């Protein structure tokens, strides 16, 4: 017997997966644009707080307005519940602010809807355990949308390191910088869910988690705080840590000129990956002086890989991703917790 998602048996790759989105903002627009290129997928519903935004989203992506849900008075809650209850929706792309992920992911899973949840999926390891428990209890797929793992460059990097050509990994450095400006998104200024570690640092943590086994130990964290109503948020982080004994230097900065790279130092050379959150270009520098450029373009765009992968998992009746597993989401949350709890 196949796995039942919503009201249909989806262990049949001839059946389209019918997606709905929770949150009709910029990220959902990017998801919807990529989904149009995915075989076996349809976007059939959208929910948000603002009626005008939901109406615009439905028009932009040819969604029947009967499946466009909005409720401004309760921060969108009635709209999100209505979409989750929609019998014509099989799977949900969860693009609400980070702090709302756990609640709405669990509600969707309990309703039998598969969930693709934007990064960071959770704000703590405790929240990760809660989602994993519900996913396993209900037998419904949950996957964190850690898009860099689904870019073709990611597999190339893993293959190169696994080949042993560069030897073992000696250390890793990540640098992520951008200028948030004076008026960033409101969730970035929320003391409970804002700051640059959650927003961009989670991408670097995703690389660390995937490349290195073993325990995480954070030796130091220097933070530049920004005062906001109700507290403060980290506007820059400089972290020294190790995983499995491999030293890591991690930099996130929301008040700097753009830079994004991951440098993996190995015994016989190094691998520098540009734009670590959406990688297409890397340089291999060998100890003998040779430098090789690796160019691995996206298939369609940087969202397509994760969206296509999730759709295929749902069609196949899988309960988790082999690329971004439930254990990986929990371990990423554990690493971020360790960083955040370092004085």
Where are these regions (language model features)?
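N-terminal Rossmann-like dinucleotide-binding module
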Residues: 1-63
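Short active-site oxyanion
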Residues: 41-45, 65, 90-92, 194-195, ...
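Conserved N-terminal Rossmann-fold NAD(P) cofactor-binding segment
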Residues: 51-85
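Beta-strand-loop-alpha-helix segment that lines the small-molecule cofactor/substrate pocket
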Residues: 91-147
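A contiguous active-site-proximal alpha/beta segment in oxidoreductase catalytic domains
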Residues: 122-181
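Rossmann-like dinucleotide-binding domain that binds NAD(P)(H)
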Residues: 182-257, 263, 327-330
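NAD(P)-dinucleotide binding in Rossmann-like oxidoreductases
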Residues: 228-235, 243-312, 318-327
């Amino acid at each position: 017997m196949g796995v039942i998602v919503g009201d249909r048996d989806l262990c049949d790759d001839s059946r389209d997966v019918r997606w709905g989105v929770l949150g009709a903002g910029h990220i959902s627009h990017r998801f919807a644009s990529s989904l149009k290129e995915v075989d076996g997928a349809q976007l059939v519903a959208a929910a948000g707080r603002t009626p005008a935004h939901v109406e615009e989203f439905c028009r932009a992506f040819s969604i029947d307005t009967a499946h466009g849900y909005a409720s401004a008075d309760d921060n969108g809650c009635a709209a999100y519940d209505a979409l989750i209850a929609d019998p014509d929706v099989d799977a949900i792309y969860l693009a609400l602010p980070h702090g709302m992920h756990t609640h709405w992911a669990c509600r969707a899973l309990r309703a039998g809807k598969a969930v693709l949840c934007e990064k960071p999926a959770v704000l703590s390891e405790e929240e990760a355990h809660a989602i994993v428990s519900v996913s396993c209890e209900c037998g419904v797929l949950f996957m964190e949308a850690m898009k860099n793992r689904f870019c073709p460059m990611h597999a190339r990097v893993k293959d190169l390191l696994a080949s042993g050509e560069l030897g073992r990994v000696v250390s890793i450095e990540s640098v992520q910088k951008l200028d948030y400006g004076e008026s960033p998104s409101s969730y970035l200024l929320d003391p409970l869910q804002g700051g640059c570690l959650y927003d961009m640092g989670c991408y670097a943590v995703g690389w660390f988690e995937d490349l290195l086994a073993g325990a995480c130990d954070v030796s130091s964290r220097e933070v530049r705080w920004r005062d906001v109503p109700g507290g403060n948020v980290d506007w820059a982080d400089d972290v020294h840590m190790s995983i499995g004994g491999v030293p890591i230097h991690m930099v996130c900065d929301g008040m700097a000129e753009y830079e994004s790279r991951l440098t993996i130092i190995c015994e016989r050379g190094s691998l520098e990956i540009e734009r670590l959150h959406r990688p297409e270009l890397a340089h291999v520098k060998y100890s003998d002086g040779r430098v090789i450029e690796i160019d691995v373009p996206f298939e369609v765009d940087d969202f397509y890989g994760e969206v296509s992968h999730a759709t295929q998992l749902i069609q196949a009746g899988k309960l988790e991703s082999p690329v971004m597993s439930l254990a990986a989401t929990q371990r990423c949350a554990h690493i971020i917790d360790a960083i955040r709890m370092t004085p």
